[in-house]
Amino acid sequence: MTLPALANVPSSPDPAALLDAYAAHLEAGGRKASDALGAARQFLWRWPDPGVFAAARLEERLSVSPKMGAFITFLITRGHLRPGYDYLIARRFKLLRQEMEGTNLARDVERFAEAAKALGFAPRTRAYMASQAAARLLIETGRRLDELREDDVACFEAAVEQARARTGQHLYTYTACISYTRVVLYHLGVLLEPPSRLGAARQSWIRRMAGVPDGLKATFVAYLERLVGTHAPQTVTGRATHLAQFGRFLAEVDPDLSSLVELDRRRHIEPWLSAVTEARHHRSGEPIAVAEQKNRILAVRRMLEDVAEWGWPDVPDRRLIFASDLPRIPRPLPRYLPPEADRRLVEVLEARPHRIVADALLLQRACGLRIGELLDLELDCVHEIPGNGSWLKVPLGKLMTERMVPLDNETVALIDRIVLHRSPGRPLRHPRSGRLVEFLFTHRGRRVSKQWLRSELSEAATEAGLDHAHPHQLRHT
């Protein structure tokens, strides 16, 4: 992706005026001016127009001396230089906050940080967001905070992807900070639409596809994009993981394979089916469960059937995976927590510091909710029915049906406590209907995730002395 040219490139000030302004800045800060001014003169002798510096090769821009770098920081924070996202990503700014004191940049960054605080972001996360994302966005665009646009954030994201490809570094800090910044800008009213997960999800799919042949990777990603409109996000993510595992296996057994149409039952599918039965968990090293084996096979079978039904080109013209290839799964009755284990777990959850997720688990237990139903609850989910008490409206879930669950006074008080701990902010789009919704469970301006719930329950179960617990057990307890 080629980054667009800036619409508000700074004008070229007189070098003498820049030196005078820098000297006054140094004097106001009580710093020695001689060496710093000497470095500034050298910079302006080499690049009388700071815009020429911005157009130089990245290696040249990064090779200047530290004292010259301090002058560059001054130019940046005063709006005289847009050094390029590649430079802003590659360079570590030690004195950025100090240098921008008293500027519009500082005021905008402070306003951004206050909004992040109101949404519940921790101090360290807020600091990273402000410096790594917000400040760099404002510097390179030359805009005030209220003037930022979706295109500006997308341009920054594209620059991070270019830097990742150029350096081989993951740059996860930048990726996360930009994602969080979208949330803050939306709740500030700067961005008009809630953050879309599709862009971040697509990058996640591409990263998962590492080691997959390019031809297959393109088909897999296109298939996942097609699923977004009809499947839950976690379903698409799981499908991406399974297709990536399949693609890496194919790369090992047939490095020259470049298209699905080349797949052969004897040469590719049967060896892969055998490999699935012998697969081990990437962390524990234990054999994967039969249910996971079935999910891996089903993901590939459904993909092959879907693309053939849709009439995609270069796909197999015959069935490659059959019902007899799927392992049979034992069907035990739903497991519940024994009374003593349930009592210990509730005591631990009542004392956990992360109230929003701990209370979510307590509400799931009290109402017998599926985890998806729990997280889809809306802020106005409690309904008072005259003469019949309080009821919880459970939204469309796994079975695509709504239902009402009676509430006792203790559970109503629990929901009131959840409302106090949830993150405030603007409504978010429902992943299925697309309508704007005030969800009950929000944190840092976004929805609480299933992963966080599972992690919280796992930690609480360990603290309570339980070997294992998963959210669905709470539904049946």
Regions flagged by a language model, labelled:
Residues 1-319, 328-331, 347-352, 362, ...:
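Charge-rich, intrinsically disordered N-terminal extensions
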Residues 120, 124-125, 357, 367, ...:
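Short, basic (Lys/Arg/His-rich) helix/loop patches that form interaction surfaces
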Residues 193-212, 312-347, 391-402, 433-448:
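Flexible interdomain linker/hinge and immediately adjacent N-terminus
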Residues 271, 376-423:
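Conserved tyrosine-mediated DNA breakage-rejoining catalytic core shared by Y-recombinases
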Residues 290, 330, 339-375, 432-436, ...:
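Basic, Lys/Arg- and aromatic-enriched nucleic-acid-binding interface segment
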Residues 305-314, 363-387:
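Short, charged phosphate-coordinating catalytic segments
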Residues 370-374, 378, 403, 411, ...:
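Extended, hydrophobic alpha-helical segments in both membrane/secreted and soluble proteins
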Residues 408-466:
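Active-site/catalytic core of tyrosine-dependent DNA strand-transfer enzymes
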